[in-house]
Amino acid sequence: MSTIFSKIISGEIPAHKVAETSEFLAFLDINPLKRGHVLVIPKKEIDYLFDVEDELYAGLMIFAKIVAKALKKAIPCKKVGVAVIGLEVPHAHIHLIPMDEVSDLDFSKPKLKLTEQELSETALKILNAFKD
């Protein structure tokens, strides 16, 4: 089964990537709750996060932590929230969301509609935060 995330990994579908290793990828959510909303995924296609084997799961969490630190530098916020929903795309993924209040993690709220330029600028800010 080839998910939209697998197509992003292969380059078939473009994405605003902010971090990548041989096993993991982080990219901007195109329907974000807040500017800087990042999705972190294993490159191995596994539907449910808690079905990911332990070593890969631990690596994913460490990768998410690294991305979250850069995200917090790039997008001023009190904290970077973490959410696992997994109902829309059958590929394990973690949401990293800049937050200043609990309601920033409310997935029932309308999503932002950012332009391609706004997404590119946000991705660049996060990429540059890795260099600091």
Annotated model-derived regions:
Residues M1-D132:
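HIT superfamily nucleotide-processing domains
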